[in-house]
């Protein structure tokens, strides 16, 4: 489904190995008693993950409402590869244990031994988790940890459209700002236009939340007319109405596909690879900012203002990463990008080799203004700032070193 390199070929193995330790580090130490209500699950030793093959795959699919399959290449004979595969299995086993009562099953499909089954199921990308629910197939493009995978699958179990029926639910809807969201106003669940909307929602579930209301009072507060659908870009206050209501499923899907890359979007554990692979000409504009930190919050607010002022520019897309969401990756990012993530940063990253160049802050105590940030972004979009310039500087430094040796 996705053939692009994930954060660079060399970066992938390190990144994935780091993510695998989440399960181990997140498990309470043995001998430490948790209070009632805070008893974290520990693997009970029961094998629940199924090796799916040509003989059993039909029965496996009949057994579970939702089935998550890890499509993997055969582990190599060396100790490190064997250990890594065991850890991946353990992550799936713990997730299977937690979700056993929810009717969620887990399986393994070997890309060599079970190639025929993989072909029938449409599995194409090794080391990916494919989730099957009814007629829908969802590729999980998130962090490979038990907690994140469980959270994702719980979302999969939810209905693709959430109904807004009162003031509190409306307030909760309005508080969602860090992801795309849609809301439509329809006569009832039996409306053919609502059913088209629901079918469209299934295409993006659970990555993009779809909401609907049948309440005229709620619709009035949202300035929605009957059968009208509003699309909210992430971090944008004002929606865009999908034109030519009432809309068919195909029209809704097409509109979302065309507009799903927000001007400012947040890297999230449950969709990190999907976001990273959606680059513009092989690069990302990346901003690091801790929302809980005063400087990070101020910088993020400036980013939001710049994004809102430039939302009509299809060439501008900024990925915001909150380091607090990825503590295990902070040392890796600091080393790879040669930056200090204790302070806000913004730069350009080449997705192929992770080469990067970062905005110089004139004064560490004075963060860039919206105008300064816009000027820098304009230089990036015009190609005046790019990672190749940084390579040239490195070459010059190497030449200087050679001269010193002479």
Curated annotation (Swiss-Prot):
Phosphotyrosine sites (modified residues): 43
Keyword Mitochondrion applies: yes
Disulfide bond entries: none
InterPro entries: Calsequestrin, Calsequestrin_C, Calsequestrin_CS, Calsequestrin_middle_dom, Calsequestrin_N, Thioredoxin-like_sf
Glycosylation sites: 350
Localization per Swiss-Prot or TrEMBL: Endoplasmic reticulum; Sarcoplasmic reticulum; Sarcoplasmic reticulum lumen; Sarcoplasmic reticulum membrane
Tissues and organs where the protein is expressed, per its UniProt entry: Detected in skeletal muscle and in smooth muscle from vas deferens, aorta and stomach (at protein level).
Pfam families according to UniProt: Calsequestrin (PF01216)
Similarity annotation: Belongs to the calsequestrin family.
Protein's recorded name: Calsequestrin-1
Name of the gene encoding the protein in the UniProt record: Casq1
